């Protein structure tokens, strides 16, 4: 007997700030995803991918300014991995960005994580998902600490700062203190 169920998790899109993609352009792309009907147009089973304004339950996603005047780069590359539902999201994003003059090249990494992915250093954007499980804060901390994505996305100084911050969070004696520190 095979069981079908949907687990709580989150889909993420990370953007590498570089000469090809400025902070303002990255904010515009995030705005296109969160403030447009892009997520509602996904031809997926109901509730498989649903829009959210939270990273984890109770943790709001910071919203930058919506600026339609910021021109997008002429070309970008999106690297993404399983689950297969992200194929649909990637294709919809490609179509939406094309209407705005940005050609999005899609690269699919056929795995459930970034281990062994040789394109991480080249992509402008990376998309994947994480299951949350029983301990959302622990999941987030482990994702930030252990995922092979971060050393490719952050500078050495940024990555060292991230690790030092996570170490300081883990030094908190109580779970509530650790969770509060992780939020900040």
Residues covered by each model-derived region:
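Local pocket/hinge segments that shape ligand/substrate recognition
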Residues: 1-68, 150-163, 184
């Amino acid at each position: 007997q095979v069981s079908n169920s949907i687990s709580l998790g989150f889909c993420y899109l990370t953007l590498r700030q570089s000469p090809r993609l400025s902070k303002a352009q990255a904010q515009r792309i995030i705005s296109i995803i969160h403030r447009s009907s892009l997520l509602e147009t996904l031809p997926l089973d109901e509730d498989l991918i649903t829009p959210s304004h939270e990273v984890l339950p109770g943790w709001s996603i910071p919203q930058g300014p919506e600026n339609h005047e910021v021109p997008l780069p002429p070309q970008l590359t999106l690297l993404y991995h399983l689950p297969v539902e992200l194929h649909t999201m990637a294709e919809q994003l490609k179509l939406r960005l094309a209407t705005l003059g940005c050609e999005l090249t899609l690269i699919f990494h056929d795995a459930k994580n970034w281990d062994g992915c040789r394109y991480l250093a080249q992509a402008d954007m990376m998309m994947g998902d994480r299951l949350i499980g029983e301990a959302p804060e622990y999941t987030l901390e482990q994702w930030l600490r252990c995922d092979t994505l971060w050393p490719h996305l952050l500078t050495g100084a940024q990555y060292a700062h991230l690790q030092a911050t996570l170490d300081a969070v883990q030094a908190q004696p109580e779970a509530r203190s650790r969770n509060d520190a992780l939020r900040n």
